[in-house]
Amino acid sequence: SEEDLIASRDHRIFLGFPMGAVTTWYRMMDSMRYFRYYVPFSGSLYWGNRTTVAQYGWDNPNWTAQLLEDAIVAQGYTADDFYVLTLTGTKDFSYRTVKMQIDDMKQHPDMFHYDSDEVKGNFTLLLAANEEHDYHAKRLYIFNALPILSQMIEKREQQ
């Protein structure tokens, strides 16, 4: 039921690669009642709604974090209500736009608490050295993300 889905959001993850990563960001903007954890692999909001991107500019990194923050607040959630684990490769063609978005999110510390220690903040970027935009990288990201997410869920249950 709808109530059960909402009540169990702390055990639900939305994950995607690469256009699935764009979908992941958009689900964070409209479906937080169903998911606490968001794991975009090699994709950013820059690849999303062309109207929004055209409005703000392709190389303007100053709109994605505000767009996310406004959507989170509009849903009635705060910085304590989500965790984002972003992964990409240093040779992935998406690296540039992912990094631009993460850098913009770091400029909004009231909502996005960046920490390279993936169990302290509410969002983390992990980079895979020399990984490209391919199946091998995706498998590597899943392999590394699942234990981190498991730790996050366990930590949450102990509170």
Give the residues covered by each predicted segment.
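Non-catalytic cap/lid and distal C-terminal segments of serine-dependent acyl enzymes
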Residues: 1-159
